Amino acid sequence: MAKRKAAFYWMTVPALLLFFVFHTFPALQGVFYSFTNWNGFAKTYEFVGFKNYYYLFQDDNVGNAYWFTFKFAVVVTVIINVLSLLIAMGLNASIKARNFFRGVYFLPNILSVLIVGYIFNYLFSNVFTVWGENLGLGWLSTNLLGSQTLAWVGVVFVAVWQGIALNTILYLSGLQTIPTQLYEASGLDGANKWQEFWKITFPLIAPFFTINMVLAMKNALMVFDLIVALTNGGPGRATQSISHLIYTGGFEGGEFAYQSANSVIYFIVIAVISIVQIRYLQRRETDM
């Protein structure tokens, strides 16, 4: 028995040490530096208290980044969950080449975000514009990512295209847990497809809906790679997410301490949003 416990310790302790060294300790360092004026490379720094946090709320660039990120996250989360649920229901039906289509729809999830971003950057710049000119569509003949007002739509499109894959698989796994006898019984009672969805399907996949909503929102709030590959925050700062602002300001703009404070605030924001989502959606699960 003692040998078995020792084996568990030998497996657990190294993992915890690695997690602490490469995750927890740097995070605590970030909190520490958020109370200083360190620029990221100087040998000295001074403690400034909560000044960095105070100035964050006065910074228009920070406000614009939060506005874009929240707008982007809400739109992406809603679209991804609606489309992925519809696709999952289609893939769960008795159709030909069902396994083939399941593999095709999951393909975007295994591709690198940066690779997808650079590919779509090329498509928006060199392919879609040619299509627009040939079809006589003015809105498509110009690079969408170069528009101050519409660039975020292009980013949303790419994020949905790639993000929909994982959510579809999760919804599909939830749909496969529903006994077919329930649909047979509801058919005998005269229920239509819409009634079956709201009275049987959706209540029984509610836990999967909760997981997908939380994951989609969290991933959208943390968007970074896609912004770098598609717009790099431009044009101007029209598509600059909070993660992108923290990176560029902290590592390229000499604002390490200032953006450390920003990252602390943003961590709290994401944690609060996730907790609220989980509690609200889990309460709905029990009500259903």
Show the residue positions of the predicted features.
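A structural signal for multi-pass alpha-helical bundles of membrane permease subunits
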Residues: K3-M288
